[in-house]
Regions:
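Intrinsic low-complexity, repeat-rich intrinsically disordered segments enriched
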Residues: 1-40
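Extracellular attachment/recognition segments
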Residues: 26-120
Length: 120
């Protein structure tokens, strides 16, 4: 591991302060049989089970944009998983885990949700 010691860090122009981006990955794991109970999380304050396989998570720190990349992976051999979030916002993320691709029916199951993007 390296150590960086500096009194001042400046941008490439030599005089202005460096603009640092505040990027992070949001990660949560929920068992969704009765509620979106968090087993492990980063930047997620709580989870809500909105009905069969339909979960939403409140973020501790808002994202800078509602257009973020979200991936949901179930811990079972199902046909597919996806995001059902028609009303995106910067303070929460919604995860829908789909059991049957033919009927589009949701099913409660343990899953991992990962969201990437810039914090506000």
């Amino acid at each position: 591991m390296s150590t960086l010691k500096a009194d001042t860090i400046v941008a490439a122009d030599g005089s202005s302060p460096v603009t640092l981006t505040k990027q992070t990955t949001v990660k949560s794991y929920a068992k969704g049989s009765d509620a979106a109970v968090l087993a492990h999380s980063h930047n997620v304050s709580s989870g809500t089970d909105n009905g069969g396989g339909d979960y939403s998570y409140a973020l501790t720190n808002a994202m800078s944009s509602a257009d973020t990349a979200v991936v949901v992976t179930p811990y079972t051999n199902i046909s597919r998983a996806g995001i059902n979030n028609p009303n995106r916002d910067t303070a929460s993320v919604m995860a829908g885990v789909i059991l049957n691709p033919y009927s589009g029916a949701y099913s409660d199951m343990p899953h991992t949700m990962i969201q990437t993007g810039d914090l506000a």
